[in-house]
Amino acid sequence: MTNLRKSHPLIKIINHSFIDLPTPSNISAWWNFGSLLGACLIIQIITGLLLAMHYTADTTTAFSSVTHICRDVNYGWLIRYAHANGASMFFIFLYFHIGRGVYYGSYTFTETWNIGVILLFTVMATAFMGYVLPWGQMSFWGATVITNLLSAIPYIGPTLVEWIWGGFSVDKATLTRFFAFHFVLPFIITAMVMIHLLFLHETGSNNPSGLNSNSDKIPFHPYYTIKDISGLLFMLMTLMTLILFSPDLLGDPDNYTPANPLNTPPHIKPEWYFLFAYAILRSIPNKLGGVLALVFSILILMLFPMLHMSKQRSMTFRPLSQCLLWILVSTLIILTWIGGQPVEYPFIKIGQLASIFYFCIILILMPTTSLMENKLLKW
């Protein structure tokens, strides 16, 4: 059996990726999120496939088909809420995974990091299109507002929006194509995850010290398979608690009202995991400026390898940079809160200040602090 594991062309790939993979002996629980994201992706694909078997992508029946899934399909409510809350878990883990990368300097693996940022964009696009599918009020108006942002693109904007809509407003054509894209994108994400892992296994994993760990590596199995399984059980426990006790905790009550183009909800807002970007978008009074800030708020992650000025890779031994990172985390939490608030004083001001702070910390304060720490260490 051992020989087959090491010699069979297909099993050999799995062996080198998950069994005999040399792994640093000191990686902490922060390195669990990669496997948890993989588990989330599998859950989303399975539950999504089961939902797609009962869902109809038509404006007249979409809302009713979701109701039918919850009421008449065996454990349909469980599948639907597992899919909706699974998306929330996905984003929680994504943000933790990115945060870990920033803290421990994992972005110095440039190829792995950049494919990860592209993955983030793809997952965000998939989640946005999935939110449109139940065809509730927030689905419809969210789709209208977010797709309309593309009209800010000079010259081709308005044509591009109509092209995406498949008409002169968000309608049947829009819903059908969003369903098609929402169905196919997770498989593209899976392929991209494989590329992400391919690049990662070229360099090997980073570790909390940020030092080269070639002299101290252990096999992935059984040490980290057990660790990943314990993380997975903890995740499933949390997810099931959320689904069974408060499935609508992270959702919007407006989405239980069927889409009505003639009636605008008082506060149009996306799901909680997009609120920080939505707050940055709203904090700029100019439409094009807002769209650029929105895109750049995530695209800025690609600049991290270039903005790394420290002689040390990880933040483990850099207390000043640690303080800045936690201020950045608090800024993002403030932005998330602001994104869910109405557009009025004092929320507008807080949002603008938090947005400025977000960009300043990443572009100016973090590199400057790194240089200062180098000086303090006489490097």
From Swiss-Prot:
It is found in: Mitochondrion inner membrane. One of its GO terms (biological process) is mitochondrial electron transport, ubiquinol to cytochrome c. Its cofactor is heme b. It comes from the Eukaryota. It is a multi-pass membrane protein. Heme b b566 binds at H97, H196. Belongs to the cytochrome b family. This is Cytochrome b.
